[in-house]
């Protein structure tokens, strides 16, 4: 109990606690105690001024703290002899005036903001200078490495963001509205003007969004049983797999899982996801979730193409060539959980992703759905990414399953099955048409973006003999 660690002074005025260093405050169960004084490395709590009954508290209830320091103080039981023999250094330290951290004034904050924007401007100028050399390197016929390609892409995006930012510079007194505009549109400024606090806030918001999306996907993906038919034997392997995972609950082999995953191509998967699931995927991938269903599918396909090119570049150069920030960004862009994981664990997760994508040829949309499906679970729920992938396939919508069966090259589908599948597709088309009619502006924007051609990113200048042929296109 606390009374075993505290002792009364000769004048019976209070209690003392031996400290490892001078403290500037005391709290008991998060309640500050204002009546205390320092005495040769000890604290004297005057119970005449602060009516606190110590007998009902445990030692963990009392916290001594020091403003500006996170040092933990010792709670050894003092004796009167130790108090008398206290070192002179401790007494000298206690006589020093305590420094109180003051909040910066308005002028200091304005000055700090101006310096931050000035440093960001100089940093942007250096990036433009570096990127101009990379453009010249491309013009003479050399290929860029992954790091150089990402540097050039980031600089081009920052230059594009300067167009709306220049309005606040040209229009008189428009800079007064800049903080409000940045608050409403966080991506308005180039990346060089973003401070560490804003980056951490965005990461925390993305983690929160991904947890919500993961829970929503698990609740919306249907878990009902498929209707299996034994009329043909060409797709027996495909049907046996889903009978195992959804009817009998058996675990298929990894070879069966790989073969079945290859049937779920990216276009088929995206075309048979509902709007709620498409919006959830866009939010999970940190994309714009506004627009028609075709626009959402286009955004997801475009991001997946970028990830596939990046996969090939990392596979050629090796995971060990990535720095720690690049490793975190690579895992984060693929929907892999990064919070609380060591760099060694992240390298393992990224290596599994590359093996699934490059070596085994599993479609990227199914892998992203698998990451989103398992993101909300605690670490250790799945033994491996393969188990999460199996659960994802066991929860796919019925429309996606039926469309995949029809799309199989060796599958002979009866007219009755074709009629049912066509009705399902007709319902999806009608829902999309209704949404386009309600939002004509979004449909026009989607048409314009489809006409725009995306620039192919450059990969490293290395032999691609280790990449399968289906991944070189």
Curated annotation (Swiss-Prot):
Ranges annotated as spanning the membrane: 162-182
Segments of skewed composition (Basic and acidic residues): 434-452
Residue ranges, annotated region (Disordered): 430-473
Stretches of the chain found on the membrane's Mitochondrial matrix side: 183-473
Keyword set, alphabetical order: Membrane, Mitochondrion, Mitochondrion inner membrane, Transit peptide, Transmembrane, Transmembrane helix
Biased composition (Polar residues): 462-473
GO cellular component: matrix side of mitochondrial inner membrane; mitochondrial inner membrane; mitochondrion
Primary site of residence: mitochondrion
Subcellular location field: Mitochondrion inner membrane
Letm1 RBD domain segment(s): 205-398
Any GO BP annotation: mitochondrial translation
InterPro entries linked to this entry: LETM1-like_RBD, LETM1/MDM38-like
Chain segment of the transit peptide: 1-73
Bilayer topology term: Single-pass membrane protein
GO molecular function: ribosome binding
Listed PANTHER family: LEUCINE ZIPPER-EF-HAND CONTAINING TRANSMEMBRANE PROTEIN, MITOCHONDRIAL PROTON_CALCIUM EXCHANGER PROTEIN
Function, in words: Involved in mitochondrial potassium homeostasis through the mitochondrial K(+)/H(+) exchange regulation.
Protein name per Swiss-Prot or TrEMBL: LETM1 domain-containing protein mdm28, mitochondrial
């Amino acid at each position: 109990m606390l009374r075993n660690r505290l002792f009364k002074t000769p004048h019976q005025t209070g209690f003392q606690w031996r400290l490892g260093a001078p403290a500037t405050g005391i709290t008991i169960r998060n309640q500050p105690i204002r009546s205390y004084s320092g005495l040769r490395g000890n604290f004297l709590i005057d119970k005449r001024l602060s009516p606190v009954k110590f007998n009902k508290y445990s030692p963990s209830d009392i916290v001594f703290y020091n403003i500006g320091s996170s040092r933990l103080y010792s709670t050894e039981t003092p004796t009167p002899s130790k108090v008398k023999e206290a070192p002179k250094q401790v007494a000298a330290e206690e006589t020093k005036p305590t420094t109180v951290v003051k909040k910066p004034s308005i002028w200091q904050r304005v000055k700090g903001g101006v310096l931050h924007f000035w440093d960001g401007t100089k940093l942007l100028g250096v990036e433009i200078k570096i990127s101009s050399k990379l453009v010249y390197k491309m013009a003479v016929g050399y290929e860029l490495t992954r790091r150089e390609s990402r540097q050039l892409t980031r600089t081009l995006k920052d230059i594009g963001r300067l167009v709306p930012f220049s309005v606040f510079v040209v229009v008189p007194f428009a800079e007064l509205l800049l903080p409000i505009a940045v608050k409403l549109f966080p991506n308005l400024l180039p990346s060089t003007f973003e401070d560490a606090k804003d980056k951490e806030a965005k990461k925390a918001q993305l983690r929160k969004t991904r947890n919500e999306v993961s829970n929503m996907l698990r609740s919306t993906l249907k878990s009902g049983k498929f209707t299996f038919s034994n009329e043909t034997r060409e797709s027996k392997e495909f049907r046996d797999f889903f009978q195992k995972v959804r009817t009998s609950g058996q675990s298929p082999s990894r070879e069966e899982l790989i073969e079945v995953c290859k049937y779920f191509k990216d276009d088929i998967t995206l075309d048979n996801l509902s709007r709620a699931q498409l919006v959830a995927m866009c939010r999970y991938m940190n994309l714009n979730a506004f627009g028609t269903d075709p626009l959402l599918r286009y955004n997801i396909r475009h991001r997946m193409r970028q990830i596939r090119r990046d996969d090939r570049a990392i596979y050629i150069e090796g995971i060990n060539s990535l720095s720690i920030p690049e490793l975190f960004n690579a895992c984060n862009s693929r929907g892999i959980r990064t919070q609380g994981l060591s760099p060694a664990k992240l390298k393992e997760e990224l290596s599994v992703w590359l093996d699934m994508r490059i070596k085994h040829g599993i479609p990227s949309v199914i892998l992203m759905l698998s990451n989103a499906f398992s993101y909300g679970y605690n670490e250790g729920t799945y033994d491996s990414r393969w188990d999460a992938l199996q659960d994802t396939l066991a929860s796919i919508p019925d429309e996606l399953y039926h469309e995949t069966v029809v799309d199989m090259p060796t599958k002979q589908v009866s007219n009755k099955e074709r009629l049912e599948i066509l009705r399902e597709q007709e319902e999806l088309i009608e829902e999309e048409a209704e949404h386009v009619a309600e939002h004509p502006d979004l449909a026009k924007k989607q048409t314009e973006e489809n006409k725009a051609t995306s620039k192919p990113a450059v990969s490293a200048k290395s032999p691609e003999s280790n990449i399968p042929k289906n991944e070189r296109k």
